[in-house]
Amino acid sequence: NFNVIPPVLEGVRLLFGCELNIVDYSGTIDLSERMLKRLSYTVVSLHDLCLKPGTMEDNTFAVLTALKNPYVTILGHPDDGKFPLDYEAVVKAAKDNHRMIELNNTSLTPGGSRIHAYENDRIILPLCASYKVPVIMNSDAHFTTSVGDHARAEALLKELNFPETLI
């Protein structure tokens, strides 16, 4: 309930955000504009519980359209091989729409649910560097012990000599 949360708590300005699901190949997201207006940041993502993985063309069109939404801030884990994407088109759209791309530490966990994430991030990150698209690291912690754990993401950024100015 946004009405009971103060905008500043113990001297810290609070930011509000959520992860949005792309629910169709037209790029529709699953939160009303009324709620989106109250958020500081949003991450838009493809999840196979919300949308059956489609063709590269279908998935890419959905992402490109979602990135045009003025309430979207970040594209979440575009590295999931279950949803093939035209990575160059996606990175260009992120640049054109002033969006960040998430580098998700959990995606890089061996045996995780996202397939070929490491290989796909090795394609996405150089494109981000080339087009000067900022990335944001996220632990994507689903349990307290993983909060703030960016070890795999940091190692990949270092391996690729990714510019710190874009992180």
Describe each PLM feature range.
Residues 84-92, 111-127, 144-158:
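Histidine/acidic-residue-rich catalytic or RNA/ligand-binding cores of hydrolases
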Residues 100-113:
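His/Asp/Glu-enriched short active-site or ligand-binding loop at hydrolase and phosphoryl-transfer sites
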Residues 1-103, 158-164:
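Extended substrate/RNA-proximal surfaces in nucleic-acid metabolism proteins
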Residues 146, 163-166:
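Long, positively charged, glycine-interspersed low-complexity recognition regions
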Residues 21-23, 108, 144:
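Short, active-site-adjacent cap segments at secondary-structure transitions
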Residues 133-147:
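Short acidic/histidine-rich active-site segments
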Residues 18, 139-142, 167:
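Acidic carboxylate-rich catalytic motifs and surrounding loops in phosphoryl-/glycosyl-chemistry enzymes
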